[in-house]
Amino acid sequence: MRLVLLGPPGSGKGTQAAQMKETLQIPHISTGDLLRSEVVAGTPLGLQAKQVMAQGDLVSDAILIGMLESRLSHTDVVKGFILDGYPRNLSQAAALDGLLAKLGHPLNAVVQLEVPTDVLVERIAGRAQAEGREDDTPDAVRKRLQVYNDSTAPVIGFYQQRGILLRVDGVGRLDEVSQRIVVALGC
């Protein structure tokens, strides 16, 4: 099962990816974690990314797709993977699609975790308050969610056109949402 988890900040993507890793017995690939590990390992792509980040810029899609190509060549992904945090825009979705076609392993499904904005704001602002972070005010969270929605809406359409988008209600207990994902995937 080759799967992407999509959802706005606070939707529970990382939490559900960790749960699905156990349920489906396939690796969870977080692009953020992948980027950090490549930088720490000092790989050529990691060194490029480190230089870009040191200048305060965003890591290019070409570097990210290169890191993903390297990661997807490992033997632990033979039975599949769960990708979280990528793609974030249409250009990345097209690049991922091209990479997976080249590898002969297209995606089986893209799960969109759907959570109402008010619930997301409550989750993120509550988490920020618990962690003592003052930057995640309700207004700041709403702005982040709008940026996410603007960039990700075309990605959702991209996968919907391919017939692999599954919309799952992301509200509820961890086990309830996990069960909805398993049912949607037909596992």
Curated annotation (Swiss-Prot):
Record field: catalytic activity: AMP + ATP = 2 ADP
Region described as NMP: spans on this chain: 30-59
Protein residues bound to AMP: 31, 36, 57-59, 85-88, 92, 133, 144
LID: annotated segments: 126-136
The keyword Amino-acid biosynthesis is annotated on this UniProt entry: no
Compartment(s) of residence: Cytoplasm
InterPro entries in the record: Adenyl_kin_sub, Adenylat/UMP-CMP_kin, Adenylat_kinase_CS, P-loop_NTPase
Gene Ontology terms: biological process: AMP salvage
UniProt key word Aminoacyl-tRNA synthetase: no
Chief location: cytoplasm
Binding site for ATP: 10-15, 127, 172
Keyword annotations from UniProtKB, A to Z: ATP-binding, Cytoplasm, Kinase, Nucleotide biosynthesis, Nucleotide-binding, Transferase
GO cellular component annotations of the record: cytoplasm
Enzyme Commission code(s) on record: 2.7.4.3
GO terms of molecular function: adenylate kinase activity; ATP binding
Family named by the database record: Belongs to the adenylate kinase family.
The protein's role, per its UniProt record: Catalyzes the reversible transfer of the terminal phosphate group between ATP and AMP. Plays an important role in cellular energy homeostasis and in adenine nucleotide metabolism.
Subunit structure: Monomer.
Protein name (Swiss-Prot/TrEMBL): Adenylate kinase
